Structure formats: structure tokens, C-alpha cells
Amino acid sequence: MAVPARRTSKAKKNKRRTHKGLTAPGLSRDSETGEYRMSHRISPDGTYKGRTIIEK
């Protein structure tokens, strides 16, 4: 089996991992309540795009 010729340094390892960071969720302001919520999700009161989806 193949074995690495040299140990991978911390700098080389960290440079490879630069794209693995977390991203913030896509929040948008609700036009009816003014609260921030995730895009394309039903709001906590059960409405989506001005229509009632879930009766409370």
C-alpha cells in the first residue's frame, strides 16, 4: 500500500480546509410580521406568502 513520503504540515492541512467553514442561514424579513425567518419556510403563525397554511 502507498504511504505518504512526508508528514503533512499544519499549514498545508489548514490551507486545504479553508473552504469547510460554516455559512450563515439565509434569513429574510417577513413582510406581515416584520420578523426574520428562513426563506421558503412557513412562519411560526402558520402563514406562507400571505396564505394560511396551518390553522391554529
UniProtKB/Swiss-Prot annotation:
GO terms for molecular function: structural constituent of ribosome. The keyword Repressor does not apply. Pfam families: Ribosomal_L32p. GO terms for biological process: translation. Residues 1-56 are annotated as: Disordered. GO terms for cellular component: large ribosomal subunit. Residues 29-38 have a biased composition (Basic and acidic residues). Transmembrane segments: none annotated. Keywords: Ribonucleoprotein, Ribosomal protein. Residues 7-20 have a biased composition (Basic residues). The keyword Ribonucleoprotein applies. InterPro entries: Ribosomal_bL32, Ribosomal_bL32_bact, Ribosomal_zn-bd. NCBIfam families: rpmF_bact. PANTHER family: 50S RIBOSOMAL PROTEIN L32, LARGE RIBOSOMAL SUBUNIT PROTEIN BL32. Belongs to the bacterial ribosomal protein bL32 family. This is Large ribosomal subunit protein bL32A. It comes from Listeria welshimeri serovar 6b (strain ATCC 35897 / DSM 20650 / CCUG 15529 / CIP 8149 / NCTC 11857 / SLCC 5334 / V8). The lineage of its organism: Bacteria, Bacillati, Bacillota, Bacilli, Bacillales.
